[in-house]
């Protein structure tokens, strides 16, 4: 199933998928959103780093590579300690409602980048990329952003 038209409908589908995944996990927070790899043909999403350390005010970028062309059907999520994941970016570069403009996304095809232009203390979290070009949607392994004091 390939998605070519993006918008509100896709945002809702992404959120529904995450909520269903959380519900099936039987946990409220601190889940590990791993790749749904293992089935032949599943798209593997590989994030550049498992950990990144930065300081308040710095610019930081996280990259994500898809194992095949996924057009611009990539979302980015933020999961703070003890909380459920929140959608930040959908369709590679569109900020979800209420997301601060310091968060941006870019890319298409196989290479994607998520950037925080000026890191704030509250940005301490794990960030995940996800493709929804094909079923099942698959996640990157996550990048934990640590803030230097």
UniProtKB/Swiss-Prot annotation:
PROSITE patterns, per this entry? IG_LIKE
Against SMART domains, the record matches this protein to: IG (SM00409), IGv (SM00406)
Q: Where is this region: Framework-1?
A: 42-64
Identify the stretch(es) annotated as Framework-3: 98-129
User: SUPFAM superfamilies, alphabetically?
Assistant: Immunoglobulin
Keywords, sorted A to Z: Adaptive immunity, Immunity, Immunoglobulin, Repeat, Signal
Residue ranges of region Framework-2? 76-90
- According to the record, the residues making up region (Complementarity-determining-2) are 91-97
Region ranges (Complementarity-determining-1)? 65-75
Sequence segments annotated as region (Complementarity-determining-3): 130-138
- Listed GO CC annotations: immunoglobulin complex; plasma membrane
Q: Where are the sequence repeats?
A: 26-35, 38-47
UniProt record, GO biological process: adaptive immune response
Q: What else is known?
A: The mature chain has 12 additional residues at its amino end, due to a tandem duplication of 36 nucleotides after the codon for residue 36. Residue 42 corresponds to the N-terminal residue of typical kappa chains.
Any idea what this protein is called?
Answer: Immunoglobulin kappa chain variable 6-17
- The organism is Mus musculus (Mouse)
